[in-house]
């Protein structure tokens, strides 16, 4: 089941995120956030979804502000993470599809994904949803003894209008 995340989901989300932070360059964080910090992130995101098997969170995806300055408010940065045993199962596709549908319905115009490279699985996933590579920052992050590039992918969610639409608030709903 896919549903809106709540602050109470922070521990389940951290169970997925902590090993990614500790053991991979996928996230450029050097230390995992605390449960309280993760709960605050969930509360302030534009959209945050979790996918469960039974009552166990096996993945999450969120749309965060692309940048803090006001003119960027119609663009979101998308991130998706799955538990090791959920990868390759199609759950990531379902989760990303729901997230993109939700932010599009709310009025966002662009979605961006920053991907630490190399990461062929993430690149294939985002490109299969119509994201196109628009930039690459070389040697932008140093983690685990090596320099890493970040590629940026973009998908237009709707045609831009002038003036742009208002962004509708996040609504707590249970999805597919």
Residue ranges and their predicted role:
Residues 88-101, 121-128:
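Conserved acetyl-CoA-binding loop-helix of GNAT-fold acetyltransferases
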Residues 103-115:
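Conserved GNAT acetyl-CoA-binding A-motif
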């Amino acid at each position: 089941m896919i549903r809106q995340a709540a602050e109470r989901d922070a521990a389940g989300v951290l169970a997925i995120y902590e090993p990614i932070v500790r053991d991979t360059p996928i996230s450029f964080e050097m230390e995992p956030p605390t449960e309280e910090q993760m709960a605050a992130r969930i509360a302030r995101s534009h959209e945050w979804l979790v996918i469960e098997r039974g009552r166990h969170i096996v993945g999450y995806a969120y749309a965060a502000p692309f940048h803090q300055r006001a003119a960027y408010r119609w663009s979101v940065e998308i991130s998706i993470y799955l538990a090791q045993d959920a990868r390759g199962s199609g759950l990531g596709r379902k989760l990303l599809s729901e997230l993109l549908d939700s932010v599009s319905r709310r009025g966002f115009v662009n979605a961006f994904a920053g991907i630490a490279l190399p990461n062929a699985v993430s690149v294939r996933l985002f490109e299969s949803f119509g994201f196109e590579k628009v930039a690459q920052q070389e040697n932008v992050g140093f983690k685990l003894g090596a320099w890493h590039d970040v590629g940026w992918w973009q998908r237009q969610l709707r045609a831009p209008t002038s003036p742009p639409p208002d962004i509708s608030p996040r609504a707590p709903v249970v999805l597919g």
